Amino acid sequence: MKAALLIESLTGNTQKAGDRIANDLQQVGWTITGVSRVKVPDFGSIQDADMIIVGTWVHGLFVVGQAPWGLGAISHLPAMQGKKAAVFCTFALSPGKTLDKLTSTVSLLGAEVIGGLALNRGKIEAHSEEFVTRLVDSVPVQV
Protein backbone atom coordinates (compact mmCIF):
# COMPACT_ATOMS: atom_id res chain seq x y z
CA MET A 1 0.00 0.00 0.00
CA LYS A 2 1.24 3.49 -0.84
CA ALA A 3 0.35 6.35 1.51
CA ALA A 4 0.70 10.13 1.46
CA LEU A 5 0.51 12.08 4.70
CA LEU A 6 -0.80 15.63 4.89
CA ILE A 7 -0.11 17.26 8.25
CA GLU A 8 -0.99 20.57 9.87
CA SER A 9 1.00 21.14 13.07
CA LEU A 10 1.35 24.15 15.35
CA THR A 11 3.64 23.05 18.18
CA GLY A 12 5.17 19.98 16.56
CA ASN A 13 2.99 17.33 18.22
CA THR A 14 0.95 16.59 15.09
CA GLN A 15 4.11 16.51 12.96
CA LYS A 16 5.71 14.12 15.46
CA ALA A 17 2.64 11.88 15.25
CA GLY A 18 2.67 12.01 11.44
CA ASP A 19 6.37 11.15 11.29
CA ARG A 20 5.83 8.26 13.71
CA ILE A 21 2.86 7.00 11.66
CA ALA A 22 4.91 7.18 8.44
CA ASN A 23 7.80 5.31 10.05
CA ASP A 24 5.55 2.63 11.54
CA LEU A 25 3.77 2.11 8.21
CA GLN A 26 7.12 1.68 6.48
CA GLN A 27 8.07 -0.91 9.10
CA VAL A 28 5.10 -3.05 8.03
CA GLY A 29 5.91 -2.74 4.34
CA TRP A 30 3.96 0.32 3.21
CA THR A 31 5.52 2.88 0.87
CA ILE A 32 5.28 6.52 1.91
CA THR A 33 4.94 8.66 -1.21
CA GLY A 34 5.37 11.88 0.78
CA VAL A 35 4.80 13.78 4.01
CA SER A 36 3.78 17.39 3.44
CA ARG A 37 1.93 20.26 5.05
CA VAL A 38 -1.78 20.58 4.34
CA LYS A 39 -1.22 24.17 3.20
CA VAL A 40 1.62 23.15 0.86
CA PRO A 41 0.59 19.70 -0.36
CA ASP A 42 2.84 17.50 -2.46
CA PHE A 43 0.45 16.89 -5.35
CA GLY A 44 2.61 14.15 -6.83
CA SER A 45 2.61 12.16 -3.60
CA ILE A 46 -1.18 12.47 -3.35
CA GLN A 47 -1.59 11.27 -6.92
CA ASP A 48 0.78 8.32 -6.40
CA ALA A 49 -0.84 7.18 -3.13
CA ASP A 50 -3.61 4.63 -2.57
CA MET A 51 -4.21 5.97 0.96
CA ILE A 52 -4.26 9.60 2.06
CA ILE A 53 -3.70 10.27 5.76
CA VAL A 54 -4.72 13.72 6.98
CA GLY A 55 -3.70 14.92 10.43
CA THR A 56 -4.26 18.20 12.22
CA TRP A 57 -4.54 19.59 15.71
CA VAL A 58 -7.60 20.53 17.73
CA HIS A 59 -8.30 24.14 18.55
CA GLY A 60 -11.04 25.52 20.74
CA LEU A 61 -11.79 26.79 24.21
CA PHE A 62 -10.60 24.10 26.62
CA VAL A 63 -13.50 21.62 26.44
CA VAL A 64 -16.00 23.45 24.22
CA GLY A 65 -15.95 24.53 20.60
CA GLN A 66 -13.26 22.08 19.50
CA ALA A 67 -12.63 21.85 15.78
CA PRO A 68 -9.86 20.63 13.52
CA TRP A 69 -7.43 23.40 12.64
CA GLY A 70 -7.12 24.16 8.94
CA LEU A 71 -10.45 22.83 7.67
CA GLY A 72 -10.46 25.52 4.99
CA ALA A 73 -7.07 24.39 3.69
CA ILE A 74 -8.12 20.74 3.92
CA SER A 75 -11.28 21.45 1.94
CA HIS A 76 -9.11 22.93 -0.85
CA LEU A 77 -6.92 19.85 -1.25
CA PRO A 78 -7.16 18.16 -4.66
CA ALA A 79 -9.97 15.72 -5.43
CA MET A 80 -9.33 12.24 -4.06
CA GLN A 81 -11.79 10.10 -6.01
CA GLY A 82 -10.86 6.43 -5.89
CA LYS A 83 -8.59 6.86 -2.88
CA LYS A 84 -8.99 5.64 0.65
CA ALA A 85 -8.26 8.00 3.51
CA ALA A 86 -7.74 7.99 7.25
CA VAL A 87 -7.70 10.97 9.58
CA PHE A 88 -6.19 11.83 12.93
CA CYS A 89 -6.02 14.79 15.26
CA THR A 90 -3.86 15.64 18.24
CA PHE A 91 -5.44 17.18 21.31
CA ALA A 92 -4.65 18.29 24.86
CA LEU A 93 -7.93 18.08 26.79
CA SER A 94 -10.75 16.89 24.54
CA PRO A 95 -11.09 16.34 20.79
CA GLY A 96 -14.84 17.00 20.86
CA LYS A 97 -16.32 16.24 17.43
CA THR A 98 -13.09 17.03 15.60
CA LEU A 99 -12.79 13.60 13.96
CA ASP A 100 -16.36 13.80 12.65
CA LYS A 101 -15.70 17.23 11.11
CA LEU A 102 -12.38 16.11 9.65
CA THR A 103 -13.92 12.92 8.24
CA SER A 104 -16.74 14.89 6.64
CA THR A 105 -14.37 17.39 5.02
CA VAL A 106 -12.06 14.71 3.59
CA SER A 107 -15.08 12.71 2.37
CA LEU A 108 -16.27 15.74 0.42
CA LEU A 109 -13.01 15.54 -1.55
CA GLY A 110 -14.16 12.15 -2.83
CA ALA A 111 -12.05 9.90 -0.63
CA GLU A 112 -13.49 6.90 1.20
CA VAL A 113 -12.54 7.64 4.82
CA ILE A 114 -12.07 4.28 6.50
CA GLY A 115 -11.26 5.49 9.99
CA GLY A 116 -9.65 7.95 12.31
CA LEU A 117 -8.24 8.39 15.77
CA ALA A 118 -7.78 11.24 18.23
CA LEU A 119 -4.26 11.19 19.66
CA ASN A 120 -3.65 12.69 23.09
CA ARG A 121 -0.54 14.87 22.90
CA GLY A 122 0.75 13.25 26.10
CA LYS A 123 0.54 9.79 24.50
CA ILE A 124 1.69 10.52 20.94
CA GLU A 125 3.84 7.40 20.57
CA ALA A 126 1.28 4.91 21.93
CA HIS A 127 -1.65 6.50 20.10
CA SER A 128 0.30 6.74 16.81
CA GLU A 129 1.08 3.04 17.10
CA GLU A 130 -2.62 2.32 17.76
CA PHE A 131 -3.58 4.38 14.69
CA VAL A 132 -1.20 2.36 12.49
CA THR A 133 -2.42 -0.96 13.91
CA ARG A 134 -6.05 -0.06 13.24
CA LEU A 135 -5.25 1.28 9.77
CA VAL A 136 -3.24 -1.76 8.70
CA ASP A 137 -5.91 -4.11 10.09
CA SER A 138 -8.66 -2.31 8.16
CA VAL A 139 -6.98 -2.50 4.74
CA PRO A 140 -7.06 -5.78 2.81
CA VAL A 141 -3.67 -7.27 2.06
CA GLN A 142 -2.61 -6.62 -1.54
CA VAL A 143 -1.03 -9.52 -3.36
Give the label of every model feature segment.
Residues M1-A4:
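Extreme N-terminal starter segment of soluble prokaryotic enzymes
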Residues L6-E8, F88:
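Short hydrophobic segments within beta-strands
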Residues S36-P41:
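Short acidic loop-to-helix transition motifs that present clustered carboxylates
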Residues N13-K16, A22-V35, D48-V143:
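FMN-binding flavodoxin-like domain, especially the glycine-rich phosphate-binding loop
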